[in-house]
Amino acid sequence: AGHEVQVSDLYAMRWKAGYDADDSGAPPVGEFWRPTLDSKQAFAQGTQSADIVAEQEKLLWADTVIFQFPLWWFSMPAIMKGWIDRVYAWGFAYGVGEHSDRHWGDRYGEGTFVGKRAMLIVTAGGWAEHYSPRGINGPIDDILFPIQHGMLFYPGFEVLPPLVFYRTDKTDAGQFADQCAALAERLDTLWQTEPIPFRRQNHGDYLIPSLTLRPELAPGQSGLAVHLRSE
């Protein structure tokens, strides 16, 4: 489809998953190591470790970011979560924008990655029915909510519906060909696909500073689905 691609193969890169004081390249802020303040200082002063900077540059370069991973214990593998922990620095992916009685930071629909799109490609060993609305594992959209809403929408990405493949350890050649075709179709239509309609934090749907949904919106309802626009 003519896309230019950069790949971060975390296992091949031997990516360091744990964020620690060595990532800042500078003395810790204060007597005790405080990860958020350490991250803020390192990003502001340009002392982050080189591997973190390289991944941040990829994010700024891309117009679409795709996270592909197996579903391990209802989430992404630790190495990818560690990528988020280290690359999403204060001042880069969070801690941006003003905080006032009308605007609570640039996040949840605003932020560094506004204008960019993100999508998950997930492989799961269980059946699709296991992840259905009444399935034993819970709905797949609920399982992926902390990633799609909390890790992607939070810093500003428009989040596309995920592409999930089930029973992947039982995939035969014909099914694999179908999966490849489904993936190709999604890649060809990245910019025509409607994003998940998450509510934006600072656009009137939430009370500030409590950040609770206004009572007149989805009255009497609770749960993750209330954070989706219904109109």
Would you name each region that the model predicts?
Residues A1-V96, A181-E231:
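N-terminal beta1-alpha1-beta2 submodule of the flavodoxin-like/Rossmannoid cofactor-binding fold
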Residues A17-D22, Y131-P133, G174-F176:
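Short aromatic-enriched loop/helix-cap "lid" or pocket-rim segments at secondary-structure transitions
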Residues T64, R117, P161-P162:
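Well-ordered beta-strand positions
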Residues V5-S8, E158-Y166:
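Short beta-strand elements in bilobed, periplasmic/extracellular small-molecule ligand-binding domains
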Residues W15-A17, A128, D169:
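Generic structural signal for helix capping and beta-alpha/helix-loop junctions
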Residues A1, I136-D141, A173-A181:
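C-terminal/domain-terminus segments
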Residues G95-F153:
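Short, glycine-/small-residue-rich phosphate/pyrophosphate-handling segment
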Residues F165, D169-D172, E185-D188:
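Basic, glycine-rich
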